[in-house]
Amino acid sequence: MIEKIINQYQKKLFLIAYSGGIDSTVLLYKMLKIKEKNPQIKIRAIHINHNLHPSSKKWEEHCIKICHKYKIPIITKEIKILLKKNIEETLRIKRYNTIYNYLLNDEILLTGHHLNDQCETLFLSLKRGSGPTGLSGMSIENFLGKKRIVRPFLTKTKKELQKWACENNLESIEDFSNFNIDYDRNFIRHKLIPILEQRWPFFLKNCFRTTVICREETKLKNIFLKEKIQNLINFDESLNIQNFKNINKEVCKALIRYWISLKNIKMPSYKTIECIYNEIICSKKDSNPKIIIDKNEIRRYKTSLYFIKIQKDISNIFLFWHNTDKKLLLPEDLGYLIKNDKGFILPSPKKNELINIRFQLEGKILILGREKRRKIKKIWQEHNIPPWLRNKIPLLFYNNRFISAIGLFVIKEKIINKEKEIQKNWKISWINNVHFNRKNFFLFY
C-alpha cells in the first residue's frame, strides 16, 4: 500500500516526521525498504522535541542514533509553549510551523497517522460540534501552504503497524504521556475506541468511510460555492451581500463561510457564522455592526461585507514634515507621502507654516467645488469611505489650518494676497497599498 502511494510521486524527496514512536518508526523502515528498490529516492527525517517529558532528550537521542545507523540525515528542533490551555492544539500548530520551515520546496512530508488517529480526530470533531468539513478528518494527501503532506498509513490500523514492527524487531520508544486520559485524544483512544471495537469490529473502517463521504460532500459543496461566489467578490475582496436577504439563509451562511475560508484563518465556529448572519447581514443599512474573529473583524459597509485586520488607533498621531524633499513615512503600514510631479495638486504653505499630517478631523468643512460647508462625516460617505478607514487617511495641515485629505479633496479658501501674486502650488503623492475604485471613487485595503 505505502509503496504504491510513494511511487505515484515524480519528485522523490521525502521528509519523515519522526517522533521515535512505533508509527513513525514503521514509516521510517518502510521507506528504507522502498529506497532499496528505488535508490533515486532521498529521505530525511525531522524530530520535534516538545520538552514536556523528563525523557524528551533521551527520545531525541534515540531518533538521532537510529537515523545515523541507517545514514538518514535528521533535523532536531525543540519547541516550548507557555500556555497551559489547549496544549494539544497549540503544540500541533507549532510543530507543523516548525516542520514547514525545514521542508524543501520539492520535498514531501510523510507522517505516520493511521486509521485509529483518523477515528480519534472524528470523535474530537464531533465533540466540538463540527459540520461536514470538520468531520472530513485527515486526508491521505493535502497541502501545508504550498507544500505536500502525505499520510500513507491512514487506512491501516494501529494493530497492523504494531504487528509489522514486532515481526521486524523494530526499535521504538513509548511516550507515556499518551496514556494520560486527561487529554481528550487519549481519553478517546483508551476509554472509548476499545469498547466500540469490541462491540463492532468494523467500526474503525466505517469511521474512515464517514470521513470520506463528508470530504466528498464538502468538495461538492465547495464546487457549487466557488462558482456562485465569483460573482459576489468585489475588486477589494469584500463580499457583495446586496441580495442576501432574497437568498435562503443556509446558502448565505455557506457563502460567508466559504468567503472566510479564502482568508487562510482558522474557520470560525457555527455560532460565529450564525452571529455574522443575524447581527450583520440582517441589520439595518445605517448600522455599523462588527464581529471580531481572532485579530480580525468582519464588518459591513453599505452592501458589502469586509474582512479587516484589527489595527492600532492612530487618530491622535501628529507627523511633522520638516523636509519635503524627503518622503514622509506614515504609521501602521499606510505607506508614505512624497513630493513629485505626479501627485495631488495643493496650495503651497506660507512662510513659517509648519506642514503636519494628522488622522482625525471633526466638524464642518467647505471643499473645493462646493458652495456649502458640510459635516466631514457626510463627505466621507460621499467618497464611499467606510468608518474604519476614515482615521487612516493622511490629512494635510499647515499649522492648524486644514488643507486637504490627500488624494481625495482640497479645502476651498479665500486667498487674500496684498501683493497680488499668484499662489504657487505643489504636488503630493500618497504611495500606499490601497486599492482605488474609480467607479465608486474610493479605496479599500
Curated annotation (Swiss-Prot):
Xref: InterPro entries: Lysidine-tRNA-synth_C, Rossmann-like_a/b/a_fold, TilS/TtcA_N, tRNA_Ile_lys_synt, tRNA_Ile_lys_synt_N, tRNA_Ile_lys_synt_subst-bd
Binding locations of ATP: 19-24
Catalytic activity from the UniProt record: cytidine(34) in tRNA(Ile2) + L-lysine + ATP = lysidine(34) in tRNA(Ile2) + AMP + diphosphate + H(+)
One GO-annotated biological process of the protein: tRNA modification
Broad class of enzyme this protein falls into: ligase
Similarity remark: Belongs to the tRNA(Ile)-lysidine synthase family.
Stated role: Ligates lysine onto the cytidine present at position 34 of the AUA codon-specific tRNA(Ile) that contains the anticodon CAU, in an ATP-dependent manner. Cytidine is converted to lysidine, thus changing the amino acid specificity of the tRNA from methionine to isoleucine.
Name recorded for this polypeptide: tRNA(Ile)-lysidine synthase
Organism: Buchnera aphidicola subsp. Schizaphis graminum (strain Sg)
Gene name of this polypeptide: tilS
